[in-house]
């Protein structure tokens, strides 16, 4: 399955909520009708079945983190093998993706931009170049921007935008050095309350 390259607001309208796929700290403009789906008949929102509700939640989370279907299913399988709550495990695994950590640290304005930074060999993990967006970051790993890339205007702009967002407590960032430490796995209370991971567990448990 190919990665979606179309309008980002269309995805947010499809899910009925801001997926934070666009850069900036403000909520999506009020002109963008999140309560209606895109398309000619978007206003006619069908009543979803139980399966439909579960599927929509899975699609929403998958799109937030920019993960393809096969990858997402593999994350779920790994989460189910781990001890503890499967839904929380799933979110924690998604949060350890390098592209997501780069976004959380503020080096990329969006997860898509952060993924691009990683793919273009702009990011170091513990001093070594890593160009795999799905690379799993571990506790106490240090993520930084390559010295020759630190003058990039988009990275500086991203840090300015990130300064206006609520700072994640599980990462520690030095904007001057353009490096940060992944201190720990985020707890469920650290993450968005707008996600109902239990619906995803129910979907994959069928």
UniProtKB/Swiss-Prot annotation:
Part of the 30S ribosomal subunit. Contacts protein S5. The interaction surface between S4 and S5 is involved in control of translational fidelity. It comes from the Bacteria. This is Small ribosomal subunit protein uS4. It comes from Shewanella denitrificans (strain OS217 / ATCC BAA-1090 / DSM 15013). GO terms for cellular component: small ribosomal subunit. One of its GO terms (molecular function) is structural constituent of ribosome. Keywords: Ribonucleoprotein, Ribosomal protein, RNA-binding, rRNA-binding. One of the primary rRNA binding proteins, it binds directly to 16S rRNA where it nucleates assembly of the body of the 30S subunit. The gene is rpsD. InterPro entries: Ribosomal_uS4, Ribosomal_uS4_bac-type, Ribosomal_uS4_CS, Ribosomal_uS4_N, S4_RNA-bd, S4_RNA-bd_sf. Coiled coil: none annotated. GO terms for biological process: ribosomal small subunit biogenesis; translation. It holds the Pfam family Ribosomal_S4. Residues 96-156 form the S4 RNA-binding domain. Belongs to the universal ribosomal protein uS4 family. PROSITE patterns: RIBOSOMAL_S4, S4.
């Amino acid at each position: 399955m190919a990665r979606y390259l179309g309008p980002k607001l269309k995805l947010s309208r499809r899910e009925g909520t801001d997926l934070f796929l666009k850069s900036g700290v403000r909520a999506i403009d009020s002109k963008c009708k999140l309560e209606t789906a895109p398309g000619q008949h978007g206003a006619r929102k069908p009543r979803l079945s139980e399966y439909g509700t579960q599927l929509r939640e899975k699609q929403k989370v998958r799109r937030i983190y920019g993960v393809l279907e096969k990858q997402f299913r593999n994350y779920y399988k790994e989460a189910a093998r781990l001890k503890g709550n499967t839904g929380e495990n799933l979110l924690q695994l998604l949060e350890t993706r390098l592209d997501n950590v780069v976004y959380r640290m503020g080096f990329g304005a969006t997860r898509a931009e952060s993924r691009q930074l990683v793919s273009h060999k702009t990011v170091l993990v513990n001093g070594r170049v890593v160009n795999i967006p799905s690379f799993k970051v571990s506790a106490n790993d240090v993520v930084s921007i390559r010295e020759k890339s630190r003058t990039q205007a988009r990275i500086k702009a991203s840090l300015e935008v990130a300064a206006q967002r609520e700072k994640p407590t599980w990462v520690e960032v030095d904007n001057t050095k353009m490096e940060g430490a992944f201190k720990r796995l985020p707890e469920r209370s650290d993450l968005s309350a707008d996600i109902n991971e239990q619906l995803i567990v129910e979907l994959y448990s069928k």
